[in-house]
């Protein structure tokens, strides 16, 4: 008997000698966007293997730093869905933008993979938005190098490594990129209620920047959604844990 994940269909990948769960939709591609101040390298470490396990090709756009950050991410979704529907998603800001895009393109979105949403509606005092604004101000006051050093002073080693690489990659546009993300409204709960495709939501039980209450609220608002959780301390040693939680939630939502 196959486990719950494989009830949606599976086949043997003879080249790799593994059982590959088949996606419950006709989509063949998943486009995953990074979070605020993050990059495609981290997204790949989270989602590449879990997506391959369900037969989806991962498209992981790199951020375009600066004021065009959001529009470039949305354009990447448009381009990927030009010929056929896609599964869209991302982490934090990336999840917000995927849901925003799906609201405007419901016929081109076969599902949503929503990891660590940070707020719904206006960002206002959401911890993730406050943190991004504070970081942007620090970059402008101290310069990127000193701001990065201050940001990583009291965080776990894995997060320090991720922040250093990603923030360095944004170059002189780091502060503008952080502010652009912090000021972007996410879909409201009422808007999320209009998304009828299967949606997998993932949250962390120990993440103060992306409170689990937000992921729970998104899950309750979405008509066809499931929530799976993990912990930051696990992601620190196994980034794929976040991807597995999100993909598993999507598979569960697809069966409902």
Across the structure, where does each feature detected by a protein language model lie?
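Conserved HGGG/HGGXW glycine-rich cap/lid loop of the alpha/beta-hydrolase fold
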Residues: 2, 9, 13-67
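Conserved acidic catalytic loop of the alpha/beta-hydrolase fold
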Residues: 52, 69-86
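Gly/Ala-rich beta-loop-alpha elbow adjacent to hydrolase catalytic centers
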Residues: 90-98
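Helix-rich cap/lid subdomain of alpha/beta-hydrolase
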Residues: 116-165, 174
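Catalytic active-site module of serine/aspartate enzymes centered on a nucleophile-bearing elbow/loop
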Residues: 225-256
């Amino acid at each position: 008997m196959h486990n719950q994940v494989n009830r949606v269909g599976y086949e043997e990948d003879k080249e790799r000698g593994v059982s590959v769960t088949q996606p419950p939709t006709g989509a063949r591609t998943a486009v995953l966007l990074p979070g605020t101040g993050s990059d495609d390298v981290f997204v790949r470490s989270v989602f590449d293997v879990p997506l391959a396990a369900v037969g989806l090709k991962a498209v992981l756009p790199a951020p375009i730093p600066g004021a065009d950050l959001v529009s470039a991410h949305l354009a990447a979704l448009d381009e990927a869905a030009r010929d056929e529907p896609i599964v869209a998603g991302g982490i934090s800001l990336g999840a917000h933008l995927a849901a925003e895009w799906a609201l405007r393109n419901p016929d081109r979105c076969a599902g949503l993979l929503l990891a660590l949403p940070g707020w719904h509606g206006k960002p206002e005092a959401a911890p993730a938005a406050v943190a991004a604004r504070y970081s942007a101000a620090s970059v402008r006051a101290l310069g990127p190098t000193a701001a990065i050093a201050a940001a990583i002073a009291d965080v776990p080693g894995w997060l320090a490594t991720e922040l250093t690489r990603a923030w360095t990659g944004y170059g002189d546009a780091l502060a503008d990129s952080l502010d652009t993300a912090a000021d972007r409204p996410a879909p409201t709960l009422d808007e999320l209620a209009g998304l009828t495709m299967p949606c997998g939501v993932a949250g962390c039980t120990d993440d103060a920047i992306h409170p689990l209450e937000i992921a729970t609220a998104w899950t309750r608002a979405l008509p066809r959604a499931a929530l799976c959780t993990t912990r930051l301390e696990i992601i620190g040693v196994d980034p794929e844990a976040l991807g597995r939680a999100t993909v598993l939630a999507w598979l569960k939502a697809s069966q409902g």
